[in-house]
């Protein structure tokens, strides 16, 4: 079982819109293997506050997602991650749902440090791409940072995950 907390900020200059997000996720991987395939699922909740500096517009989006997870891990510690799921976003009195997907790869750089690369997206949108680092502070407690681009914007992410 893993619990994760994430924070994101995305500021666009044209139009001048700021997004501030906070999220929480629970991951359960009942089929685990040190090498080869592992499989599980993830449930996520997120909130994004949107502020448009050009107008007095401000609102909050809420998002719920359910994702199937598959990982293929090599003996070298490298891992390929494949995800597919569905999300629902509620904002300004409306609700929309979309299929989601992701593919990622991680490389061990040191005993507790990994480089990460991922491409992810959702139905009807172009993919986002990100590069990052994940560091295991103590056994089971990981912090991560990533920066990326996609859909005409640049973004950064900071996260923390606790495996228990």
Predicted regions, residues:
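Transmembrane beta-barrel domains of Gram-negative outer membranes and organellar outer membranes
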Residues: 1-164
């Amino acid at each position: 079982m893993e619990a994760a907390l994430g924070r994101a900020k995305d500021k666009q200059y044209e139009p001048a819109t700021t997004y501030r997000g906070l999220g929480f996720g629970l991951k359960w991987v009942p089929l685990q293997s040190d090498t080869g395939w592992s499989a599980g699922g993830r449930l996520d909740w997120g909130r994004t506050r949107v502020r448009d500096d050009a107008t007095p517009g401000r609102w909050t989006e809420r998002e719920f997602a359910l994702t199937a997870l598959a990982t293929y891990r090599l003996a070298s510690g490298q891992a390929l991650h494949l995800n597919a799921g569905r999300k629902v976003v509620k904002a300004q009195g409306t609700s929309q749902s979309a299929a989601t997907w992701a593919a990622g790869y991680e490389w061990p750089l040191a005993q507790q440090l990994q480089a990460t690369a991922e491409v992810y997206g959702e139905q009807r949108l172009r993919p986002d791409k990100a590069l990052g680092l994940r560091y295991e502070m103590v056994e089971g407690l990981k912090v991560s940072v990533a920066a990326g681009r996609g859909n005409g914007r640049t973004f950064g992410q900071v996260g923390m995950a606790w495996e228990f």
